């Protein structure tokens, strides 16, 4: 560092801002430092700023950072240190610090009003005066980035896309007007003329992300929660739990020289542990739990139907895909009692992790941070739904897509090819073949059929591979006859096809006992958060084959035979569809404005 060197010199000496992004601010000093902004960038750095601080450090924020999200992390870090008996002098203002965090949390979730900024000023002024501080980061963040607080509160928008409850897709000025996005949008919520910037109607958008996959220039802003993970890992007294969806393991390897469809789950576990995640579990385990609830619900509806109960709702519709659920809520508000009430595997996992697993370890919900590694951008929207929370503590804290995780690994110089295999943690990492095939089209209904039929007949099936349910048509149907049971099953992947099929059901033109619906081509393997591929159909088929291969190789291929699933019922939930199971694992649907 040269004598009289500037902040810009220091940043350059450290290797610059990742991705050569534009400088926004630099935070100095812990536990309560302040901000240096752009006007200080090329001035000589005043090292006296650090003399009265416990840590002499600088954290540089880029233009893609959210000030509210960072301020919230800063307070969480301080509170974590205090819980570890550090910074004891701050115990005098612990009440004010905790209230500051709660106000910032409200702002980040779109639940605040402008009076909350006034309250923040009062709280932080009390902290500053009581401790005789020169700087207070939250006060300085309000003064220097007031417009950002205002945008969060008054417009319900996080311009950096880091506050998950406020996430919206946006088409940026990179747009070349090629129309690729509008052509793939299944609900026609993207508009614009050729060679002119397009726009997205977020009131109609289902967040499926197919526009993001199609855009050739990366013009669609989808949010970025990579820093959320890294900051949670850095926060003292925070236990970071990752869950990995089935489709991720057969796609993420494509970015590291593996073939599409190659299962790299054990490398993925190793990489997540390497960056500091405390526990790595498998969403496929929760998919098995989903099957148990959904199959029992399906069995109940079938039995009532065959007894002549004309109030029973058929077909039962799968409820794993959040883009499909939002589409359904917007367009079929008169049919909200038709889908299964079972939560998605992601939300079931997060609920169990916080309310059962964490409790057994003596952890509160607030001490656990659940990050879901998903192939799907709509999962970010799902995680933000109020029904998947307890008060202001959401079951899934945030979602990273496959592409976001690739970004973290690349920036951390982690190459999956060079890692030793590591196993998932127990007990929420043990899954059956039924759970793994949730990641491809037809997989959810096939997994449920394996269990439903055996529940009804009481007999073990000789063949559990229902090839009639597999295929690549946008909508397909199959008539299954197994013993005395006859089932008419439908499968749709793509919201346009789903809409056509539901219109026929609503009009009484078609009848099915059960239908699986996924928003994306191929199901989750083709999700909007997956690696982009030039030969899309070829890659999708390889990913699907990869999941089928895992299923075939597993010793347990039926969800109801998973011993860790049996254990959770025996110890905590009693039995599928019990009152306890219904309280934790089921949800409701609501009409949405279009």
List where the protein language model places each region.
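Redox cofactor-anchoring modules in respiratory/redox and cofactor-processing assemblies
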Residues: 1-164, 363-367, 377-594
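Short beta-strand segments
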Residues: 2, 243-245, 317-320, 371-375, ...
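Iron-sulfur cluster-binding cysteine motifs and their immediate structural context
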Residues: 95-102, 157, 162, 167-201, ...
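Flanking helices and flexible, charged tails adjoining ferredoxin-like Fe-S electron-transfer domains
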Residues: 143, 147-167, 204, 212-309, ...
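Short connector loops at secondary-structure junctions
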Residues: 249, 274-300, 324, 341, ...
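Short helix-loop-beta junction
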Residues: 265-279, 330-332, 410, 452-456
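Divalent-metal (Mg2+/Mn2+/Ca2+)-assisted nucleotide/phosphate chemistry catalytic cores
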Residues: 298-371, 375
């Amino acid at each position: 560092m040269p004598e009289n060197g500037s902040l810009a010199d220091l940043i350059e000496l450290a290797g610059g801002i990742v991705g050569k992004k534009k400088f926004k601010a630099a935070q100095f000093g812990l536990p309560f430092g302040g901000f240096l902004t752009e006007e200080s960038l090329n001035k000589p750095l005043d090292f006296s700023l650090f003399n009265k601080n416990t840590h002499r450090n600088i954290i540089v924020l880029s233009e893609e950072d959210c000030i509210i999200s960072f301020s919230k992390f800063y307070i969480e870090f301080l509170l974590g240190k205090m819980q570890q008996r550090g910074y004891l002098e701050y115990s005098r203002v612990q009440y004010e610090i905790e209230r500051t965090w709660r106000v910032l949390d409200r702002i980040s979730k779109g639940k605040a009003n402008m009076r909350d900024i006034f309250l923040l000023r009062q709280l932080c002024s009390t902290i500053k005066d009581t401790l005789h501080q020169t700087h207070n980061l939250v006060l300085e963040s309000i003064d220097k980035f007031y417009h950002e607080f205002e945008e969060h509160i008054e417009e319900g928008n996080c311009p950096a896309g880091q506050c998950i409850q406020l996430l919206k897709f946006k088409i940026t000025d990179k747009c070349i007007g090629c129309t690729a996005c509008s052509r793939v949008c299944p609900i026609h919520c993207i508009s614009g003329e050729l060679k002119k910037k397009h726009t997205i109607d977020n009131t109609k958008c289902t967040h499926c992300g197919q526009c993001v996959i199609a855009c050739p220039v990366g013009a669609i802003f989808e949010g970025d929660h990579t820093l959320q993970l890294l900051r949670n890992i850095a926060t003292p007294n925070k236990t970071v739990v990752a869950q990995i969806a089935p489709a991720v393991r057969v796609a993420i390897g494509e970015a590291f020289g593996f073939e599409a469809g190659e299962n790299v789950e054990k490398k993925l576990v190793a990489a997540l542990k390497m960056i500091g995640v405390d526990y790595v579990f498998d969403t496929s385990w929760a998919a098995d739990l989903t099957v148990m609830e959904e199959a029992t619900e399906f069995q109940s509806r079938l039995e009532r139907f065959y007894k002549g109960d004309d109030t029973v709702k058929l077909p039962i519709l799968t409820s794993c895909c959040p883009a499909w659920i939002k589409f359904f809520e917007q367009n079929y508000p008169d049919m909200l009692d038709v889908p299964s009430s079972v939560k998605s595997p992601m939300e079931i996992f997060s609920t169990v992790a916080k309310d059962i697993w964490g409790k057994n370890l003596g952890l509160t919900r607030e001490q656990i941070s659940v990050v879901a590694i998903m192939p799907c951008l709509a999962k970010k929207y799902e995680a933000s739904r109020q029904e998947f929370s307890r008060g202001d503590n959401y079951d899934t804290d945030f979602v990273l897509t496959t592409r976001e995780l690739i970004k973290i690994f690349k920036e951390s110089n982690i190459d999956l090819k060079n890692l030793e295999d590591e196993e998932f943690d127990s007990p929420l990492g043990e899954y059956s073949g039924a759970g793994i095939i949730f990641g491809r089209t037809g997989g959810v209904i096939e997994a449920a059929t394996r269990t439903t039929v055996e529940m009804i007949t009481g007999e073990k099936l000789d063949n559990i591979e229902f090839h009639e349910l597999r295929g690549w048509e946008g909508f397909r149907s199959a008539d299954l006859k197994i013993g005395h049971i006859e089932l008419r099953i439908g499968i749709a992947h793509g919201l346009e096809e789903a809409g056509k099929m539901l219109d026929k059901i609503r009009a009484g033109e078609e009848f099915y006992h059960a239908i699986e619906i996924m928003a994306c081509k191929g199901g989750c393997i083709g999700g909007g958060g997956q690696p982009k591929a030039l030969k899309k159909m070829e890659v999708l088929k390889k990913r699907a084959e990869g999941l089928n291969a895992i299923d075939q190789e597993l010793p347990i291929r039926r969800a109801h035979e998973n011993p860790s699933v049996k254990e959770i019922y025996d110890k905590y939930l009693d039995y599928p569809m019990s009152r306890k199971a219904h309280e934790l694992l089921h949800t409701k649907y609501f009409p949405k404005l279009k």
